[in-house]
């Protein structure tokens, strides 16, 4: 009798599927600014990158941060989830850890699902490649973007070696931006090194229209336009899948 009771107590544990555990984990992550926007037609995952992108070191208390160890597994789950039709990335970030920001940008860029980025407020520093990473990028009229050289904090040991590392890192950032947008490397480097726009730094602050004119962002627009583009991309993806399926079936018959 006791054995039967113990078995029945354990049954609910065995009943929990891997899919249920995944959904539970995603529910926990919603507290970090993510949500699924769904209706009868489609399901789009929305994630936000706000404050600073936190990397290998913890930021001081009182600073808003986006933790890359939260976003990376979430992006993987979005790519693998057949129930999610696309990704909307909302950006209002001052930048942050370069390697962490590029890691997030690389994952977004390598996803097969439709993706749209929307710059709200600002997408500065490493936020620029994050905006360019999506398949389509938008910026609201009141937002801005800042381009500046790579910087480091703290003591530097070996000036020549450190400078070479920063130069290579900056080149990687420029290559990423240019390979995922219409921007030209020569112009991006020029904007990064302008000495006349900021009092304490080199660089350029771009208004929304300027970001589009330089090819960094695709167009000026808001939430409605971003969702409309996602729907168009989802419909085109479905058409392509149907065509491939039809050709595959035709090949099997032949």
Tell what function each PLM region has:
Residues 1-118, 122-128, 133-254:
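N-terminal organellar transit peptides
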């Amino acid at each position: 009798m006791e054995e039967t009771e113990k078995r029945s107590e354990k049954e609910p544990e065995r009943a929990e599927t891997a899919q249920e555990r995944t959904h539970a984990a995603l529910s926990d992550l919603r507290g970090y600014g993510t949500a699924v926007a769904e209706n009868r037609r489609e399901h789009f995952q929305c994630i936000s990158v706000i404050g600073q992108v936190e990397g290998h070191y913890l930021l001081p208390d009182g600073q808003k941060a986006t933790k890359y160890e939260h976003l990376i597994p979430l992006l993987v789950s979005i790519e693998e989830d057949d129930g999610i039709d696309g990704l909307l990335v909302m950006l209002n970030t001052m930048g942050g850890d370069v390697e962490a920001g590029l890691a997030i940008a690389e994952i977004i860029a390598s996803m097969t699902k439709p993706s749209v980025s929307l710059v709200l407020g600002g997408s500065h520093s490493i936020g620029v490649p994050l905006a360019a990473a999506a398949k389509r990028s938008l910026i609201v009229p009141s937002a801005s973007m800042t381009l500046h050289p790579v910087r480091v904090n703290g003591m530097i040991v070996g000036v020549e070696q450190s400078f070479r590392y920063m130069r290579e890192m900056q080149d990687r950032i420029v290559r990423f931006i240019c390979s995922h947008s219409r921007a030209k490397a020569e112009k991006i480097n020029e904007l990064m090194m302008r000495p006349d726009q900021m009092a304490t730094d080199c660089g350029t602050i771009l208004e929304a229209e300027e970001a589009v004119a330089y090819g960094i962002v695709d167009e000026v627009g808001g939430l409605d336009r971003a969702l409309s583009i996602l729907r168009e991309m989802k419909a085109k993806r479905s058409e392509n899948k149907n065509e491939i399926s039809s050709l595959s079936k035709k090949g099997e018959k032949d």
